[in-house]
């Protein structure tokens, strides 16, 4: 007869979880069975919430992800395929093998912030990408939907990126110094904030943009100047999202 495993007093085995994300974490953790104590489960959840891409796990490495060529339902007016592939490899592991669809573009949908919110309010995770008047390309990964919240929101999975230097991607992950990952109101969308400056701020119906270093992401200025004019802007969502 198989010996029944004992658990510490006050703990019960977890037999089933509805969340696909948590289920996938168990698979990545390669646990031989489903009997996990609550402390063990919380440890895995902490890894997930920290924004880790699980580079130390064999099934989800940046090296493997860099070989995947993502598809976009409508060709981007900003990204080149090589740039999109490079950015895709920096995403949280559960997006790295997922194709994209464009849900907003100022060339198609106009520059009104209200139109942006209408198109994007149900999109939980997205890539925001901007091209300025000098041809610089930069943006951010948003872990929550863009809605007018008038407060800071988002998670530590958010990050900023730029192709400004040598046309290779530079990523600025969250530092954990504050939780000012995203901000929205009726006039602007922003990412990162400290000392009254935003890492990325798009205002005046997406005509004007600003970028400063903040403690949220410890980022450099995302292009070559603090203030810029937005020429193109797109928001891409993930298939199934």
Residue ranges and their predicted role:
Residues 1-241:
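Phosphate-recognition beta-domain surfaces
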């Amino acid at each position: 007869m198989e010996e029944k495993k004992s658990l510490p007093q006050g703990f019960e085995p977890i037999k089933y979880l509805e969340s696909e994300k948590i289920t996938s974490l168990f698979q990545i953790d390669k646990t031989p069975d489903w009997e996990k104590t609550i402390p063990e489960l919380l440890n895995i959840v902490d890894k997930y919430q920290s924004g880790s891409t699980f580079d130390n796990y064999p099934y989800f490495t940046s090296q493997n992800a860099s070989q995947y060529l993502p598809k976009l339902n409508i060709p981007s007016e900003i990204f080149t395929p090589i740039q999109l592939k490079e950015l895709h490899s920096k995403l949280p592991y559960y997006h790295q093998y997922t194709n994209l669809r464009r849900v907003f573009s100022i060339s198609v949908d106009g520059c009104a912030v209200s139109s942006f919110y209408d198109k994007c309010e149900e999109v939980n995770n997205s890539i925001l990408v901007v091209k300025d008047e000098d041809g610089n390309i930069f943006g951010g990964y948003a872990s929550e939907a863009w809605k007018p919240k008038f407060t800071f929101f988002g998670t530590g999975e958010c990050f900023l990126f730029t192709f400004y230097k040598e046309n290779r991607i530079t990523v600025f992950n969250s530092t954990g110094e504050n939780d000012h990952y995203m901000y929205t109101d009726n006039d602007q969308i922003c990412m990162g904030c400290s000392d009254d400056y935003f890492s990325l701020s798009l205002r005046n119906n997406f005509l004007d943009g600003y970028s400063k270093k903040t403690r949220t992401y410890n980022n450099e200025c995302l292009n070559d100047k603090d203030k810029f004019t937005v020429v193109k802007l797109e928001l891409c969502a993930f298939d199934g999202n």
